[in-house]
A protein has these predicted regions:
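Class I S-adenosyl-L-methionine-dependent methyltransferase catalytic core
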Residues: 1-175
Length: 175
């Protein structure tokens, strides 16, 4: 929607056909624009429909491995993977992002950490390292406070010996 309102071309990718349908419906509004918006079902491990060095900005919000599953059995859905498998797939995402991004342009990734067996697993920083290993440089690390999380009420009522994870990172990388 923002790309259409700002008269910018955009490509939107999601693995879940329901999300694609929602996006297509949300784009049905009228405004004065010449933008071209392409919504495609798929995942970002294979962007073969985009030529090298054609994208000015990438913004992504991947799942946090298998913490919340976005489908039951969609092939290629990385929300169904273990942390190790997720990071392997994110390595492919980082490679493809690097390939399609123009030199000097930015890629923003919003992701947070997770908790496993009472310990914090720094998934955000692991994903950051994946992108750095693929050649990106770190431009900014933004800490975004989370509000109204689905599980906050549940965890606040439990007898815990740990703090709630109440933030996400927005890592801004430059090619």
């Amino acid at each position: 929607m923002e790309a259409k309102l700002l008269n910018r071309n955009a490509v939107g990718i999601d693995i879940n056909p329901q999300s694609i349908s929602i996006s297509e419906k949300n784009l049905q509004f009228q405004c004065e624009t010449t933008s071209k918006i392409r919504i495609q079902q798929g995942n970002s491990t294979n962007l073969n429909f985009v030529k090298d060095g054609r994208i000015d900005f990438i913004c992504m919000h991947p799942p946090y491995a298998n913490i919340i599953k976005y489908s039951k059995d969609i092939l290629g859905d990385i929300s169904l993977l273990s942390v190790e498998e997720f990071l392997c797939e994110m390595s492919k995402v980082a490679s493809e992002s690097y390939r399609v991004l123009k030199k000097g342009k930015m890629c923003a990734v919003m992701i947070g950490d997770i908790r496993r067996r009472g310990k914090v697993l720094p998934l955000g920083f692991q994903v950051m390292n994946v992108f750095l290993e693929k050649g990106f440089s770190s431009k900014e690390i933004i800490i975004k406070e989370q509000h109204n999380c689905r599980s906050t009420d549940y965890w606040e009522k439990q007898n815990n010996d740990f703090l709630l994870l109440s933030h996400e990172y927005i890592f801004v990388f430059q090619k």
